[in-house]
Structures are given as C-alpha cells and as structure tokens.
Swiss-Prot record:
Keywords: DNA-directed RNA polymerase, Metal-binding, Nucleotidyltransferase, Transcription, Transferase, Virion. GO terms for biological process: DNA-templated transcription. It comes from Rabbitpox virus (strain Utrecht) (RPV). It holds the Pfam family RNA_pol_Rpb2_3. The lineage of its organism: Viruses, Varidnaviria, Bamfordvirae, Nucleocytoviricota, Pokkesviricetes. This is DNA-directed RNA polymerase 132 kDa polypeptide. The DNA-dependent RNA polymerase used for intermediate and late genes expression consists of eight subunits (147) kDa, (133) kDa, (35) kDa, (30) kDa, (22) kDa, (19) kDa, (18) kDa and (7) kDa totalling more than 500 kDa in mass. The same holoenzyme, with the addition of the transcription-specificity factor RAP94, is used for early gene expression.
Length: 1164
C-alpha cells in the first residue's frame, strides 16, 4: 500500500498527537491530563489552600483579633513503591504536615502587640494522608525517580485494603453560560454563577437570577438569596456603569432583530416609569434605600456601611478587582443575551451543552475536598475558642481539635465513591479488563442527582455539543447511566493550569488587548465585549473583530502567550461577544488550521519530509500554524470542515468560510472503540454493543496479582492482536493483550450452533486456548474471643485450617470449607449440667462452585481478627461461557467437540471455533470478515519489505473502501506465492476453503469461510452465575429459596414457573414443589360462614368475625401452601377481603355396574 501521500498527511499528524512526547513531558497520552491535574494539586495547589493567615474572631471594633496562621506545609512521598504497598496490604499515601499558630493581635498606641494562644507543629504520621496517584510506570508526582514498569500505565489509587481505585470525571454543576428557563408563558429567568478566580482563597461563590415577566416589566429584577438586593436590572446596570438609560437602550438595541428591539424599548420605558414615580429620583439614593431595607431584613450585625461594602464589593466575585463601571457593562451584555434568548432560544447554548460546563478531574476532586475540609477545620477551631471563652473565660484551643483536620475521612470517602454527597465519581477497578484502566479515567459523567432533581435536564440524549470531542459509540446501552456517561475521543483532553500560570497568562492577554488604540477597545455602547473567563476587560470596535480574533489565534499558536490551549470564541448571531477562556476543566483537542481559505498543512512543503523525526510539540514549535488546540466552546462557534478530502473538493470562495478542518474519522472514536475493527462497515448498534463487550473482555495481568489481595480475572496466554489501529498501539492496549487468535469456520454444525451457540474444539481447550485464572479475595472479621475458642466437635468445615485457626497455604477450598476459625460459645444456666458450655460454628464458608487454591493469607489483629485470603483458580472454557469477536459477534459455548468430530481442510487443520454463518447476515458485521481476511493475509506475509514485523492497520472508523483491503490481501499472497491461479488466489483472498466431513471423509458441496481471527473471552462465566440447587436455605416469610449465589440461594418458584408446569399438566410436580415438603405444608382452618382463616387463641381455633356476631362458626380443616396463607394475610392487612369459599356439589349416584360373565366362550 502506498504510504506518506498527501491524502495521508492529516492521518500522520493525528498519529503524532497519540504517541508519547518526552520533550513536552508526555509519556502516556491517554491519561496525561489526569497526571498533570493531580500533580498540580499535590505540588502546588495543596500548599496554596493550606497556607492561611486570617482572623478567626474580632472584638472592640477590630482593635482585638484572634488570628490563625497555617504555614510550613510539607508533603512527603511514601518510602515504598506501589508493589510493596500491595504486599504489605497498605494504602499508597503521601503525608502532608503543617504548623498551626493561633495568636491574639491587639491594636495599641505603640503598635500591634501579639500574644500567643496556642500552636501545633504537625509531625504526626497520620495528620493528613493523601491518596497518591500512581502514574505511568509506577511513578508518582512527588518522587519521579521511581523505577519504570513500561506496561503499567497507572491512573489508579491504592486504598488501605490495597485495592485499586479509579474514577470518572464529573461535569461541574456551575455553568459558564447563564441558564435560560421558561417558567411559564411570558415569564422567564436567566440564572448565572460567579466564582472567584483561583488566586482568591477561600473561593467565593455567588448565584444570581434575572427574572422577567412580560406582564410586569417593572419587576425585571436581579436577585441573590441573602447575598444581594432585589433590584431592577436596568437600574442596577445604570448605577454601576454610570451611563444614561438612553445609552443602555442603544447598547441593547444594537444589531438586534426588530422583535427584540421592541422588548428593549418596553423594558427601558418600564425603568423610566420607576424613576418618574419617585420624586427627585437619584440612583444612588435608590440603591442605598434598598441596601438599608435588606440590612434590616437580614438583621445583620454589621454596620450599614460595612454591610453595603460587603454586598457591593463581593458582587460578581469573578470580577473581584474590576471597577464597578465594567461590572455594569457586563450586566448590560448579560441582559442583551437574555432578551435575545427569549425569541431565539434554539440559538443559545442550553444548559445541557458541554459548551456551558467545565469538567472535574482528579486534581480538582482533591482540591475541592481540601478546601471544604480546611474551612470546617478552621470553623471547629473558632467554635472551640468561643466555647472555651464562654465557659472558662480564656482563649484556648483543645489539642484534639488542632490534630484532627478531617481531610483523611474526606479522602477516604472519595475513594469509596462519595464526592459532595453524590455517587458515581469513583469506583473499584473490576480487573477483568485491562482497558478499564484507560476507559474509566477518560469518561465524563453528570452528577446522578442532577438528573433526578432537575426535570429540565435532557442529558440522556446525545447532545450535538459532544460531537468530535466524545466517542459516539462508547456509551452505556442500558441501565441508569444511559446518556449520563460519555467517553472522550482519542484526541480529546482536559485542560489544567497552575495559579501562577493563570495569573501570568491573564496579564499577558490583558496587555495584548490594551496594546490596541484606546478608543477601539472602549466601544461599550455598540462594541463586542471581550471577556477573560467571563470577566469583562474591554469592548472592541465591531469593524476590528475579525482581525483581532485572527491575530490572537496566530499569536496563540506561535506561543506569544505561553499557553497553546487558550480558547478564543467569536460569538456572533446578535449576541456579539469575544470570549477568551484560560481556566482548567475545558475540553480541548487539536484541529488542522485553515487560514484565508488555505489549509496550512498544504503550504508547508518541509513538513512532510521532516514529520517522521518530529514529535507533536516539535510540530507546534516549528510549524505553529498547521495545528491549533481548540476548546469545545471555540469549536462550537467556528466553521469546521469535517475532512481534508471534502475541503479540497470545495471552491476557493467556499474554503474561505472555514476556520478549521478535522482529522480522519478514526480520531473521533475513544480508546475502547478503537479496539474494535471497522465499525463504520457494520450496522450502528454493533459499535455500541462492541464497546460494552470489549470492556468485559478478560485481559492479561495489569498488576502483580499474587501480591495483591484483590479480585481479578486474567487471561493466561494472551496474544497481541494482528489487526489493530494506531490508538490501540499507542495506548498499549495491544501490547497488554485482551484475547487470542483462533481459527474459525462459518458454517452450521449438526444444528447445535443455532442462534448464538458456538462449537469449540476440545483439544484447543486442553492446549490452554483462552484459558484464564481467577483471583478472588475473601475477607472476614472475627471477634477475638471467637477466634481463640477451640472446637469441641470435629467439623468437616475446618478440615483445611491450620492449628492457628487460619486456612493452609496451597489448600484447595471446596464449597462449605471455612476461611478461618470462628466459634461462638454460650454458657447454660443449668446447675445440674456437668458441662454447661455449648459452642457452635459461625464461620464464613467458601461458597464458589469450583475448587480454588489458597495463594496468600493476611491477618490483622486489633479488637477483631481481620483475615484476608487470596484464592486462585485456573478455569478453562466450559459449556455456557461467553466469547466474542471485536465486531460484537457474541457467542455461547453450546458444545465442546473432539477433534475427530470436526471438519478439516486439505492440510488436516480443523477449526478451533465454529460460528453460525447466519449471524453475519442478521447482524451485518462485514468488518468481521475483513478482519479474518487481513489476519490471514498477514500470515502469508508477516514482514514488510525491510524485514520488520508489521501489524495490519485497520482503524475502528475509516474511509477506506473494502476493495482496498482486498487489494492489500492480494498483494500479500502474490508476494509469497506468485504462481497461484486466479481461482486459488481468489479462494485465499476471501478465505474460502473446501472442508471434509469427518464421518465420510468426503468434501462438502460448497466452500466454507475459514480463517484466523482475534477472539475474546468475556467475564460472564457459567460457574459464577449458576444458582440452581436442590436443597438449601429458605426465607422465613415466604419459605422460598433465598436470593444470592454467595448465600447459597436458589431460584424462586413463582407464578410463571407454576404456570409452566400447569401447561405441561404436571399437577403432581406442582404439589410436590409447593406443598409436600415439611416446611411448606400448612394446615389451615377456614370458617364456612364468612370464609375467614381461623385464629388460634389459647390453643383453640375460632373465627374472630363470627364470634363477635355471636354466631356459631363451622370450621373446616384444609391443607394449602404456606405462601398462600401469607398472601391472604397480607391482602387482609391492606383492607382487601379474600373469601375462601367451598364448592357445593350435589351428591353423585352411580348405577350398578354391568355384570361381566367370565366363563370361557366355548362353554356359553
């Protein structure tokens, strides 16, 4: 196949982003943003949050203050590696320590005198234990000198049970665009949040709502609960900006449709009516009166001046150091969007759009928790000082309060899946698929309670804003997470930025904006507002917007601002705004740059010749105008061409309309979808099902399972796939393997492999084909006295235990064997008994159906004995186990056939697996056939012309025609055997072979599709799911089999099962199942008068209803099932009377039988 052509340049550039980039510090691209996020927290942000100096209490008009100072923050890495942590059964944590000083400041004439109250130098080894993120190669951000393990990609935490934890990224609730809502007809709200910049600690949040009712325009107010006054939005804008109402009218009306202009005039007129209704109206007096009224309403302890300063100074925290005039112009720009959105709602980003949201990564989780717990810690110290002063008259702090910051509990809860009282942020890694290490940390989800609480959310639909940045295939197909969790595409990442970098970047952008002529950036009446993270900094001349944005983008790409991930969005469509985004949590990905109708990739002739020796960062430095990092907001408001091929087919005038061009379709998939093959050649649902099944595939070891007491299922003899995509290779999924190559035949086999049934060869299983090992953790807690008790009677359950009460190493556990000794004893109060001690076994038993070998035993002795046992079991495929291809052709083992029973080809080769051929037609998985063809072609020519082994690149999504792959296969066969005839060549290309019947040794009439394919074994194993049993425990209430395979449960015999047996006429079987056992048999006395079940009072059966009416009941004994009696009792308790009536039949009389003469016929 021809390589390095112009048409493949975009593909090669995309591949450069996927591979490691050591010059930029990128060693593993899929999880690099998570590593950076956590590294920023542990190295920088934690120091910023914990370093505090602020007043706790103030007295005597601030002349006396109790101060707290936290300093000397130090973070120490662990002395051991993650593997040692697993061996010891410990967590992998960093230790954070700090010094707390509490002192009293008194302002005197001589100056400020300081009196020490309390101090604590935190050197405790358990003060703050921060779970440490394990990065690529077992490295951590605190100690980069740790040794590398190439196949360990990390991205996990290890908790105190040495269990790996990974988490998804949650969509932040706060939106960067105001949320528009229709409350009722002609009534609307526009709510927005304002959050202080990252350099302002503690972080301040304010939430505001603008309300507008067409019938009451005078009440077009802005409000915020307890943090701001309720005031007319137009008058507030006038008060802050110090402009006239006519100025605001012209600003709101500029470049607006006529219907919006009409509404603008009505709102301004309504504001005028307010001013005219007040004699000698003064805007300052009007606002001051409202502030005073709010002061009285809240019963604030502050003076009126302090209250006013606090309210107005903290108005819009994200513009904390901005003059009030710019805040007023910002409010005018918000009102402008609001009025436009009323008439053109569909053109405004809705609240479900990813344009409006930032994303919480690992570092942000810990940052938020550290911030919240620090405020709780300081609050506890303040309360303790106040209580001590009230009770003892001294300013003192209990040492217990100083030594319990509370962060450990918060971090522990985070790793247990609880973040801000919402589930779903973290979960235990299941270990049955190596891809989970990548897919879970790269998934983005909404808060579950966001959807439950808000009825307006429609996040369950695939939102248009997710296009290109999220994988459209790797989404949950069923369950509560449908539409709530999405997987990032391979080119997507999430931005991170340090506080110092944020401030420097903001300063450079402001300097660049102010380098323009002053009048051109002061068009506050009719210009385009320029905002940096929603903070208004200027308003640009409308005639300069295109030149400004173009020049800004060029300077950004050239590194003028020192950050290549800055987002600049030109919002047109009458909303008129230039938005510059520099914060963390934004979705970004690279795009090819189009400048003045030219694809910049095409105007760089040196790029193609130098590309092989360059990294992605080299391309950004030496060819800065070829690729641009674009965030999702900039992408949404830009014109983007979907492919280079389509762009080149356009006319020159059409090309000038575009700003960016996308990479090929394979880069729109996520890493899990990239493990599939040719999903665009299959039907749509196969891609979604294929992603779900690929994540359920059992892969090779992701960690040292013998030293880690954790659950896991691992493939014993994995093979690297031959047909792969570039993303599969660079993410190391291919190198870590998740299947084996098997030889398949598409045919029917004696009618056994119907539907999803597959036939698997016995000798293939015996040779270790798709063999797995199951590691299972068994954990029990035993009271110390129970563990020390000795058994009085020998128990078979304790046959595998040592004398120390623990299970023996290398013992084979069977169902019913005890894990550890647990004997409960009780003393009988019987003076005549010789031995009044009784004991009984309450140990937890091994419950699996298969035997397992004890690999490791771990014991912790505290007030209880904590025993953790790791068992291992090799498990070969059996009937009922599930397998699949990478095209979602799932099959279940229906029959294990001996090699002598299977058809064979001319070389005597028999298929390892036989699959029903009709499944290809019904599921339309053409790419499965292509994979077999390419794998077979590789076997004919596994090396390229340089003698190097080369896998076959078959991306998950591609624009390559099937004929191209057929031509590739043809060249491979012609190279290895040029003397093939056309028919033989065609048979080899299309993998068609003549197979011979094993019974007659005659060839089949038609050729069979026969060839190798990469096959996966799924975690759905028969022995893990079987719950059928003959005897066992029953529930007390309904006396049916209890639930849960681990608890020895079975399948309940309910209505549907009963109906099935009735259909078969198996009356005796129903009676036997429901009645005949001793537990289910129930004698019931029924009153023939009223049909009630009789009650037993003091051993006498009586009908309560008839006895109250002084009637003489006639009770009849019937036998029924216990569950029937429970049902009747429950119905009666709910007020539903079920009457048991007896069938009244008249007596039957039969005529005498005819006499039968038994004499021999010859005597008659």
């Amino acid at each position: 196949m021809k390589k390095n052509t112009d048409s493949e340049m975009d593909q090669r550039l995309g591949y450069k982003f996927l591979v490691p980039d050591p010059k930029a510090g990128v060693f593993y691209r899929p999880l690099h943003f998570q590593y950076v996020s956590y590294s920023n927290f542990i190295l920088h942000r934690l120091h910023e949050i914990l370093t505090v100096k602020r007043p706790l209490l103030s007295f005597k008009n601030n002349t006396e203050r109790i101060m707290i100072e936290i300093s000397n923050v130090k973070v120490t890495p662990p002395d051991y590696s993650p593997i040692i942590a697993s061996i010891k059964g410990k967590s992998y944590d960093a230790l954070a320590t700090f010094t707390v000083n509490i002192f009293k400041e008194v302002m005197t004439k001589e100056g400020i005198s300081i009196t020490k109250i309390s101090s604590y130098e935190g050197k405790d080894s358990h003060l703050i234990k921060i779970p440490l993120l394990i990065g690529y190669g077992n490295k951590n951000p605190l100690d980069t000198a740790k040794y590398l393990v190439p196949n360990v990609i990390g991205g996990v935490f290890i908790n105190k049970q040495s269990v790996e934890k990974v988490g998804i990224n949650l969509v932040e609730k706060i939106t960067t665009w105001p949320k528009f809502r229709v409350v009722k007809p002609n009534s609307f709200t526009f709510s927005f949040s304002s959050v202080s910049p990252p350099n302002v600690l503690p972080t301040r949040y304010r939430h505001y709502k603008i309300s507008l009712d067409i019938s009451q325009l005078e009440a077009s107010n802005i409000s915020s609960t307890k943090t701001f006054i309720t005031v007319n939005i137009v008058l507030l804008s006038q008060y802050l900006s110090r402009v006239s109402l006519e100025f605001i009218r012209r600003s709101l009306s500029y470049d607006m449709p006529p219907e919006v202009v009409y509404l603008v005039n009505a709102i301004i007129d309504s504001a005028k009516r307010i001013t005219e209704s007040i004699t000698d109206f003064n805007i300052d007096t009007y606002i001051n009166d409202l502030v005073e009224a709010e002061h009285i309403k809240q019963k604030s302890q502050l003076t009126i001046n302090e209250f006013k300063y606090e309210m107005l100074h903290n108005f819009l925290p994200h513009m904390n150091y901005t003059p009030d005039q710019l805040k007023g112009f910002y409010m005018i720009s918000l009102l402008r969007k609001f009025l436009y959105c009323i008439y053109h709602t569909s053109r405004y980003p809705d609240r479900d759009s990813m344009v409006c949201h930032r994303i919480l990564t690992y570092g942000k989780y810990f940052e938020t928790l550290a911030h919240d717990e620090l405020e709780n810690y300081i609050g506890n110290i303040r309360n303790d000082i106040m209580n001590n002063h009230k009770n003892r008259g001294t300013y003192a702090v209990n040492i217990h309060v100083l030594t319990t910051p509370g962060l450990n509990h918060a971090f522990s809860s985070l790793l247990s899946g609880k973040f801000k009282k919402s589930d779903g942020s973290y979960r235990t890694h299941p270990h049955y698929s190596w891809m989970q290490n990548i897919s879970i940390p790269r998934s983005v989800g909404f808060y579950p309670d966001q959807v439950k609480i808000s009825k307006m959310f429609s996040v369950r639909k695939y939102h248009p804003s997710q296009y290109l940045y999220f994988c459209s295939s790797d989404v949950p197909e069923r369950g509560p997470q449908v539409g709530l969790v999405s997987q990032l595409s391979v080119l997507s990442s999430i931005t991170n930025i340090l506080t110092s970098e944020y401030l420097d970047l903001e300063k450079k952008i402001c300097e660049y904006i102010r380098s323009y002529y002053k009048d051109d950036i002061s068009y506050f009446e009719t210009g385009f507002p320029i905002t940096i993270e929603n903070a208004l900094v200027a308003s640009l001349n409308p005639n300069m917007i295109c030149d400004f944005v173009t020049d800004f983008r060029r300077r950004k790409r050239m590194g003028f601002f020192g950050n290549l991930e800055v987002g600049i969005t030109l919002v047109r469509d009458h909303m008129n705004e230039i938005r510059i985004n520099i914060g963390a949590g934004r979705l970004v990905r690279p795009f090819l740059v189009v400048d003045n109708g030219e694809l910049m990739m095409d105007v760089c002739p040196e790029l193609e010749s130098r590309l092989d020796d360059m990294t992605f960062s080299d391309i950004q430095k030496e060819f800065p105008h070829v690729i641009e990092m674009v965030d999702i907001e900039q992408f949404t408001f830009s014109n983007v061409c979907e492919s280079v091929q389509k762009f080149r087919m356009m006319s020159k005038d059409e090309r000038k309309q575009y700003d960016l061009c996308d990479f090929p379709a394979e880069f729109r998939d996520g890493y899990v979808a990239s493990s599939l093959v040719g999903i665009n050649h299959n039907s749509g649902p196969r891609a979604i099902l294929g992603c779900a099944q690929a994540k359920q595939a059992i892969s090779c070891l992701s960690s040292d399972i013998r030293n880690k007491i954790d659950n896991g299922i691992h493939l014993m003899y994995p093979e690297r796939p031959i047909v792969i995509s570039k993303a599969l290779e660079t993410s190391k999924i291919a190198a870590n393997c998740f299947g084996q190559h098997v030889t398949i035949a598409l045919m029917s086999y004696k009618g056994i492999n119907q539907e999803d049934g597959i036939i698997i060869k016995k000798q293939f299983i015996q040779r270790g084909g798709l063999d797995i090992v199951t590691a299972k953790k068994h954990q029990v807690e035993i009271p110390l006295e129970n563990f020390n008790n000795k058994e009085r009677d020998r128990s078979n359950a304790y046959s595998k235990l040592e004398s120390n009460g623990l299970v023996r190493l290398n013992a084979f556990l069977e169902s019913g064997d005890a894990i550890a000794r647990n004997i409960s004893s009780r003393t009988l109060e019987d003076d005549f008994a010789r031995d009044n001690q009784i004991s009984f076994d309450v140990s937890e038993k091994y419950t699996d159906m298969y035997k397992s070998r004890v690999e490791r035993v771990q014991v912790e002795l505290t007030d209880k004995v904590k025993v953790r046992v790791l068992t291992m079991k090799e498990r070969r495929p059996i009937l009922g186990d599930k397998f699949t291809t990478r095209t979602s052709q799932k099959g279940t083992v229906a029959y294990i056939a001996d090699e002598t029973e299977l058809p064979y080809d001319e070389n005597g080769i028999t298929p390892d697996v036989i699959i029903n051929s009709t499944s290809i037609f019904s599921r339309k998985t053409i790419s499965m056939l292509i994979e077999v063809i390419l794998t077979a072609a590789y076997s004919a020519k596994p090396y390229n012309n340089k003698g190097e082994n080369r896998p076959v690149c078959f991306p998950s999504s591609n624009e390559t025609s099937i004929d191209t792959y057929m031509q590739f296969a043809k060249q491979c066969y012609e190279h290895s055997n040029p003397k093939l005839s056309d028919e033989e060549l065609s048979d080899k290309i299309f993998c068609e072979k003549i197979l011979y019947d094993p019974e007659t040794d005659k060839p089949y009439a038609s050729k069979v599709f026969f060839g190798p394919i990469y096959y996966l074994r799924l975690r759905h194993l028969t022995q893990d799911k079987a719950t059928v049993r003959c005897r066992g425990k029953k529930t007390k209430l309904i006396r049916q089999a209890n639930e849960g395979r681990k608890r020895g449960g079975g399948i309940k015999f309910g209505e549907m099962e009963r109906d099935c047996l009735i259909a078969h006429g198996a009356a005796n079987t129903i009676t036997e199942v429901l009645k005949d056992s001793e537990e289910d048999y129930q004698d019931v006395y029924v009153c023939e008068n009223c049909g009630d079940i009789a009650a037993q009072i003091k051993g006498i059966n009586t009908c309560l209803r008839c006895s109250k009416l002084n009637l003489s009941p006639l009770l009849t004994k019937i036998d029924t099932t216990h569950v029937s009696k429970v049902f009747l009792t429950q119905m009666n308790a709910r007020g539903v009377k079920v009457k048991l009536d007896f069938e009244r039949r008249p007596p039957s009389f039969y005529k005498p039988l005819d006499k039968v003469d038994l004499k021999p016929s010859f005597l008659v």
